[in-house]
A protein has these predicted regions:
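Acidic, low-complexity central loop/insert segments
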Residues: 96-103
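A sequence-composition feature that detects small, non-aromatic residues
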Residues: 67, 78, 103-105, 141
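Hydrophobic beta-sheet segments that form the core/acyl-binding groove
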Residues: 59-96
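Hot-dog-fold acyl-thioester-processing enzymes
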Residues: 1-55, 106, 111-162
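Sterically constrained small-residue positions within well-ordered secondary structures
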Residues: 51, 67, 81, 98, ...
Length: 162
């Protein structure tokens, strides 16, 4: 698993002085980017190849929100590539205490060909550099959301895009 250590900054906290959800997700995304950069397949590589990974699905389980100033370790690992998809886990723990979990996540990414504007197959050149690891132990949810049989409940409408 690729990891980096950090300290929760004031600018990353919510009104209670704890790491915000947005910042927790930012740590996960940064971890992936740091790994890609360290492996030589970072932003410049992606620009040259006209490719981009796009997040398709997140499943994040948060056990706690660390407080400002706490030291944390953020980790990520790929656990599979199939067709256009990349499966990736994330783990955030208290620094030096790998058994003290803060959050764990499952994610699914789609590799996009930016010239064609559509998904592309993950080639060995792209996938092999990350290696394949065992999925982290967690309850994996389906990425498909079931519609309730009773049709759910009607809520206020809101404009998504004009």
């Amino acid at each position: 698993m690729y990891t980096f250590d950090s300290r929760v900054r004031y600018s990353e906290t919510d009104e209670n002085g704890n790491l915000s959800l947005e910042s927790l997700i930012d740590y996960m995304q940064d971890c992936t980017n740091f790994q890609s950069e360290d492996l030589g397949v970072g932003l410049e590589y992606h620009r040259q190849k006209n490719i981009m990974w796009v997040l398709n699905f997140w499943q994040i389980v948060i056990d706690e929100y660390p407080a400002m100033g706490e030291n944390i370790t953020v980790g990520t690992q790929a656990f599979g590539f199939e067709k256009m998809f990349g499966h990736r886990n994330f783990l955030i723990t208290h620094q030096g205490e790998p058994e003290h979990r803060i959050a764990i996540a499952n994610s699914l990414w789609v590799l996009m060909d930016l010239k064609k504007g559509r998904p592309m197959i993950v080639t060995p050149e792209i996938g092999d550099v990350y290696g394949i690891h065992e999925p982290l132990p967690m309850d994996y949810a389906s990425r498909k959301i079931k519609v309730p049989k009773d049709g759910g409940k009607e809520c206020d409408q809101f404009l998504v895009q004009e």
